[in-house]
Amino acid sequence: MNKKISGCIVTYNNIATIDKAVSTLLKCTESDFRLFIVDNGSTDGTPEHIEQNYPEVTVIRSGGNVGFGAGHNLITDRLDSDYHVIINPDISVRDDVISKLAAYLDENPDVGLVSPEVRFPDGKPQILGKRTPCLRYLFASHFRGKGEAEKTLREYAMLDEDYSKPFPIENATGCFIFIRTELFKKLGGFDKRYFMYFEDCDLSREVNRISKVVYNPLVTVYHEWHRESKRNMKLKLIHISSMLKFFAKWTFRK
């Protein structure tokens, strides 16, 4: 495999997690990989820390908190890669997942986007929606307990599929998205109407209109998922706003 791969992390005061994300990605990746950091106006020293400790990483200051999708879109004109990875600042890897996912796309030209298995740092699987969000799925996800996933959540997360091999999904989590760069550019990156949340659902749906989105449970990344919007009222309102924009867009789109 001789493909060029780019990756981007959008940060906003993420100095507590960004070092592990960047260091593990650079240490484990053997492919031709270029990493961008787009900083959305951090005041905790995040961009300075990256510049001082990781000179091989390209740091771009957006000039303010432009949001998740808009931050990622800032670098689309700079990309000359074959594949591109959208990465959360609280992701870490323990092996060469970048090369594995690139090899999967090499072998499956009908797939435009691949999503890996996501686990908590302690190894526990994260239950993430893989079907297109609807109100009953979102309600089940928001109010789920700590025990076994009930029927609706199992359906949303497609937990009854065969996890011994990759399978098609409707919705890929935005914490780690591996996509063909040409396709990402063709779609114009993320839809600019979402400041944060639901931009991954929207991108997944756009990709599925012209290609395939696949979940690959044979490749694993680790995510320090805190579900901030459950505790922070401002983020909760942003989440609701994005949800309404998503439903409005896809209800009336032909």
Where are these regions (language model features)?
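Short, flexible, basic/aromatic active-site loop/helix in glycosyltransferases
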Residues: 133-169
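Glycine-rich, basic loop-to-helix element that forms the pyrophosphate-binding segment
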Residues: 61-79
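A conserved acidic beta->alpha catalytic loop
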Residues: 24, 39-48, 64
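Short, acidic, metal-binding catalytic loop of nucleotide-sugar glycosyltransferases
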Residues: 23-32
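Active-site-adjacent helix/loop segment of glycosyltransferases
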Residues: 202-205, 209-254
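Short aromatic/hydrophobic "clamp" motif used to bind/position activated sugar donors
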Residues: 84
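A short, conserved alpha-helix in the catalytic core of glycosyltransferases
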Residues: 162-164, 168-189, 193-220
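Conserved donor NDP-sugar-binding/catalytic core segment of glycosyltransferases
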Residues: 95-128
